[in-house]
Swiss-Prot record:
<dbReference type="GO" id="GO:0051715">
    <property type="term" value="P:cytolysis in another organism"/>
</dbReference>
<dbReference type="Pfam" id="PF03784">
    <property type="entry name" value="Cyclotide"/>
</dbReference>
<feature type="disulfide bond">
    <location>
        <begin position="8"/>
        <end position="23"/>
    </location>
</feature>
<keyword id="KW-0960">Knottin</keyword>
<comment type="function">
    <text>Probably participates in a plant defense mechanism. Has cytotoxic activity against HUVEC cells (LC(50)= 1.83 uM) and various cancer cells including HeLa (LC(50)= 1.81 uM), MCF-7 and K562. Displays very weak hemolytic activity.</text>
</comment>
<keyword id="KW-1015">Disulfide bond</keyword>
<protein>
    <recommendedName>
        <fullName>Cyclotide hyen-M</fullName>
    </recommendedName>
</protein>
<comment type="similarity">
    <text>Belongs to the cyclotide family. Bracelet subfamily.</text>
</comment>
<dbReference type="GO" id="GO:0006952">
    <property type="term" value="P:defense response"/>
</dbReference>
<feature type="disulfide bond">
    <location>
        <begin position="13"/>
        <end position="28"/>
    </location>
</feature>
<feature type="cross-link" description="Cyclopeptide (Ser-Asn)">
    <location>
        <begin position="1"/>
        <end position="30"/>
    </location>
</feature>
<feature type="disulfide bond">
    <location>
        <begin position="4"/>
        <end position="21"/>
    </location>
</feature>
<dbReference type="InterPro" id="IPR005535">
    <property type="entry name" value="Cyclotide"/>
</dbReference>
<dbReference type="InterPro" id="IPR012323">
    <property type="entry name" value="Cyclotide_bracelet_CS"/>
</dbReference>
<dbReference type="InterPro" id="IPR036146">
    <property type="entry name" value="Cyclotide_sf"/>
</dbReference>
<keyword id="KW-0611">Plant defense</keyword>
Length: 30
């Protein structure tokens, strides 16, 4: 999986979620 430039510690993945990224271990991964 490729780490996206967004974290999801306090809020879920937002912008990167539109690119197919999902939360994993506090970081958004594609």
């Amino acid at each position: 999986s490729i780490p996206c430039a967004e974290s999801c510690v306090w809020i879920p993945c937002t912008v990167t979620a539109l690119l197919g990224c999902s939360c994993s271990d506090k970081v958004c991964y594609n």
